[in-house]
Amino acid sequence: MLLDENPSTLIHHTIGNFNIAPDKQAVSRINDSLATLQQSRELRMREAESSLRKLSRHLQSLSTQHEEAVAAHDASKHAAAMVELDTKKFRIAKAASELEIESERLEGELEMLKERLADLEAQGLEGDEATRREREADDAILLRLKIYRALGIDIEPDEAGNFTKAVIRNSRKGDVHVVNLDPKFSRFFYANYFWSTMQG
């Protein structure tokens, strides 16, 4: 009987029915995503800075060449160098603008993930109120089914999920009784019937 069970054993079995692994995994995935986004952003920034430094050095080199061209008073080379410098300047400005836009986008994603993480932390491992209530209702049904099973009674649901059949096993006699549950009979009636069948 249920009352003969050790309370610690019942509590242990009940705790085993709680499923907090998905929430813990979700928090872990969010933390991993935040770390990955941060690393990606830092890598992009380093690549952009490296590219800008290379372009700056190249620009300096071109400037030196330009100065030498001016000193040589070669108008055609000077004009070509200026055009090339303007082109590279435009490319650098465009690259910087794209990097700034990408940085703002990544920052926006990071803020959304931080808000999501804060919501999950506020809800705790048990989830929000609606989730907790649904889990408690499911746990209560599972606990009742376990108690019935421990007594030798299997309650079977129909296609709609309603419990309409009970299989009662009398281990002392080796008998098996199948009872169709009809809503017109009270729970008290079925409790007495189940008990008498198990004891009979």
From Swiss-Prot:
Domain of life assignment: Eukaryota
Record GO cellular component, one term: spindle pole body
Name the UniProt record assigns to this protein: Probable kinetochore protein spc24
Xref: SUPFAM superfamilies: Kinetochore globular domain
Residue runs in coiled coils: 42-129
Listed InterPro entries: Ndc80_Spc24, Spc24_Fungi_globular_sf
Keywords: Cell cycle, Cell division, Centromere, Chromosome, Coiled coil, Cytoplasm, Cytoskeleton, Kinetochore, Mitosis, Nucleus
The UniProt record lists the keyword tRNA processing: no
Species of the source: Emericella nidulans (strain FGSC A4 / ATCC 38163 / CBS 112.46 / NRRL 194 / M139) (Aspergillus nidulans)
Cellular compartment(s): Nucleus; Chromosome, Centromere, Kinetochore; Cytoplasm, Cytoskeleton, Microtubule organizing center, Spindle pole body
